[in-house]
Amino acid sequence: YRLTGNSNSFDAAASVGVRNQWNIAEGLVINTSAERQALRPFEGAKGDAVAMSVGALYSANPIYKIGGKLEYRTSRPTDQWNGTFAYDRKLDSNWSAIVRDLFLYTHDKWDTGAGDQTQNRFQLGVAYRDLETNKFNALARMEYRTDISTASADPKDSTTSIFSLHGNYHPVRSTTLNGQAAFKYVNETFGNVTSKWQGTLLSGRFTYDFTDRFDASIMASRMWGTGASVSGIGVEVGARLVDNMWLGLSYNKGKYVDTELFSSNASWTGWHLRLNYKFH
């Protein structure tokens, strides 16, 4: 049973299904699933949906790991295809390469004017970790996004390119310096109107660990974009709730921007509560 909500309502879905993991060979795993959902939205018509997926992961080779998943979901109003792909490869003891891709296609069966929605996110990166001292790690990443809609009333064709550098430095165990730099270019067409936007971002964070459970941070950022520039500064105190889970309370002045989503992931002046979990 699942429950999701937003600012003014809740949507519920009762689900039943089966998941299987097939160990084909050493280091090769196939995952399959089938699920039926009874959708019970707070507002709007009720409905049913069926979802099926198949995925594979190959990790027998110590040099690289490759995996992917394809999912199909159908309901009375829409059909959806969702695909993911990941490839990690060790270049040497300190360097590795990363490739990621996420694809989502949605077809509206009821409203022909809604058209089809196609989204794709492609990432290519190179990561460095100093295993000898474990004091410095860095990531250089390129991301290319496409967002296409064939809706008759509001057709859209958008492409976004993001180039970013991320670095973490630990001079001593209790101190962490984090820096990020990014460039973003957006080319969008809505109907017959085309617009372009580009921006540059610099951000940094200084974190001090008082104990293994409590820390404090100071962060700042500056973003320059077409026709505008924003900056922000903030302070945060954090506590480790359980292993790999942290809760942070911060106050920001101005607009603090993170490179993860660039202009979308921004914190305006005020108090903010943040929950982080690190997956292995």
Residue ranges, per PLM feature:
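Gram-negative and organellar
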Residues: 1-280
